[in-house]
Curated annotation (Swiss-Prot):
Binds 1 Mn(2+) ion per subunit. It is an enzyme of class 1 (oxidoreductase). GO terms for molecular function: metal ion binding; superoxide dismutase activity. Belongs to the iron/manganese superoxide dismutase family. InterPro entries: Mn/Fe_SOD (IPR001189), Mn/Fe_SOD_BS (IPR019833), Mn/Fe_SOD_C (IPR019832), Mn/Fe_SOD_N (IPR019831), Mn/Fe_SOD_N_sf (IPR036324), SOD_C_sf (IPR036314). Destroys superoxide anion radicals which are normally produced within the cells and which are toxic to biological systems. Signal peptide: none annotated. Its EC number is 1.15.1.1. This is Superoxide dismutase [Mn]. The gene is sodB. Its cofactor is Mn(2+).
Length: 200
């Protein structure tokens, strides 16, 4: 299937002051658009255009790095925009998700610390993740455009730690960006939706 740039599910000003209009304009309108444009060209050249995005990501991993980079980043960003909302974050998680975080990760405070540490500790560009693997939640980090799909897990929350995600708003203070993301931006309803789908 052809890659398409999704519209943001909120206005460009909606996430301020935690993520500015300028960041969203550059990140969505330029960076994500480039992954879509390049990904479509590379998928067509590889004869994989008819596959789903998830299948293109899995098939290109380790076999077609240019395609994987763009397909992986497109997949990651399609979800990234939905993982945020105005007035998001905080400790009031949906019950089922709260229970899973308690049983699998040791509770919200430990999740917050470990998820933020994964993002802060990713050397260079990459992502931090909350995923479902073998029925349990796990936190991980990946370089560049890689994601948990290629490691047998289903991502239900991710945060982009490429510099273009935060440099306009936070300069080199990646931990402050991660703190703002967790405390003020996460769309826990969307995380729950993905968790329930992955747990089936």
């Amino acid at each position: 299937m052809a890659f398409e740039l999704p519209n943001l599910p909120y206005d460009y000003d909606a996430l301020a002051p935690y993520m500015s209009r300028e960041t969203l304009e550059y990140h969505h309108d330029k960076h994500h658009l480039a992954y879509v444009t390049n990904g479509n060209k590379l998928a067509e050249e590889a004869g994989l255009s008819d596959l789903s995005l998830e299948d293109i990501v899995k098939k290109s991993y380790g076999t077609n790095q240019p395609l994987f980079n763009n397909a992986g980043q497109h997949y990651n960003h399609v979800h990234f925009w939905k993982w945020m909302k105005k007035g998001g974050g905080g400790t009031s998680l949906p019950g089922k998700l709260d229970a899973a975080i308690k049983s699998d990760l040791g509770g919200y405070d430990k999740f917050r610390a470990d998820f933020s540490a994964a993002g802060a500790g990713q050397f260079g560009s990459g992502w931090a993740w909350l995923s479902v693997k073998n029925g349990k939640l796990e936190i991980s980090k990946t370089p560049n455009g890689e994601n948990p799909l290629v490691h047998g897990a289903t991502p239900i929350l991710g945060v982009d730690v490429w510099e273009h995600s935060y440099y306009i708003d936070y300069r080199n203070a990646r931990p402050k960006y991660l703190e703002a993301f967790v405390d003020n931006l996460i769309n826990w309803d969307y995380v729950l939706e993905l968790y329930e789908a992955a747990a089936k």
